[in-house]
């Protein structure tokens, strides 16, 4: 007990937010490390290399149009916008933390995608003949997916950590993501086209576990900044709309060409539409005088896209997608109303953006839906070849049957949860050390410690409880 108390006392020393040495050092050293590692390991794959002409002749490819770039790049554009614009602006709801929301999102995404190309490359794209990682357009999409898990985790600690801590969070988050992704997709052989398990469940519980480890008992000292103003909510809604519009591309980006990709886009499109209506209904129903809460519209309207991710390429059927979206809109909105304050009060989890309701819970639902849909698959619905193609029943898995695949899907979900919680606790212990220049409790949710701000400041109105973005909250 004495050692534990000594560690706590060491971690609770006075805060110093001056990152003039630590942030440049981390950025320079890690970027130089990326340059060296890329020089040693990373090369273009055959479709991006100048030897494409020879490869085309060898494989009897008739036209450059058959290069994977032309199939994947539109989806890559959409996913890239989601990562840098969608996630960034979604987190600008805090009245005095918009620079940090967009700027630090930009920073960790730019670093994370480089590290992700290496980590995922070592697991998936390593050419054992020459020891090089061969990258193409699909690797760029997967790197963005990898980064998404860390951006989700950032939402739980938004406004409470320093940029140096975020870089550390991203370094470990990308590493853990690459390992759990390899275990789930390659060893367990689960299917997860839209990343309900691999991205959202992992990222959600990774962030929540870190937030639990970094619990601040005196965070109410910054309560006047822990909310939104009219303009900041409008900017956050821009992020919502970008995410909502491009989510079908997110869930279908790396599925097989043809029917799988087509089906994934349709299922996501319908689930998202259904979620909007139930979110509005529940938000109005549970608010006094039936007024809508902007936090629900910004976040819960996206939950259907998260939940349909795993089963997006399965024969979920259009009505099934609507049902998934319908349920997620209800569960996510009720989570913001009841679960977020409960978790802060009783579980000591301070979830700034409510990622438990937007990512973690819908990710769990998505994993369960995927397991049930896979187990219920039949040859009469999919066709013999369609069943093999959809679930990749080839090679060592050629004798698998749908019921077994359902069990593998459930196992993949458990792995994602374990990696998220276990990894988050481990990284949270590291981030508790008083060497990262994080803000004091009375200086959270504020851009001032890390950004040069305009001289004229708006008058800050009195604010809110938890993260529900409202000045006067009557429930």
Swiss-Prot record:
Keywords: Ammonia transport, Cell membrane, Glycoprotein, Membrane, Transmembrane, Transmembrane helix, Transport. Its main location: membrane. Pfam families: Ammonium_transp. Residues 1-20, 95-98, 160-167, 215-233, 287-299, 343-357, 432-475 are cytoplasmic. One of its GO terms (biological process) is ammonium homeostasis. GO terms for cellular component: apical plasma membrane. The keyword Transmembrane applies. One of its GO terms (molecular function) is ammonium channel activity. It comes from the Eukaryota. It is found in: Apical cell membrane. The chain crosses the membrane at residues 21-41, 74-94, 99-119, 139-159, 168-188, 194-214, 234-254, 266-286, 300-320, 322-342, 358-378, 411-431. InterPro entries: Ammonium/urea_transptr (IPR029020), NH4_transpt_AmtB-like_dom (IPR024041), RhesusRHD (IPR002229). Residues 42-73, 120-138, 189-193, 255-265, 321, 379-410 are extracellular. Belongs to the ammonium transporter (TC 2.A.49) family. Rh subfamily. Homotrimer. This is Ammonium transporter Rh type C. It comes from Tetraodon nigroviridis (Spotted green pufferfish). The lineage of its organism: Eukaryota, Metazoa, Chordata, Craniata, Vertebrata. The gene is rhcg.
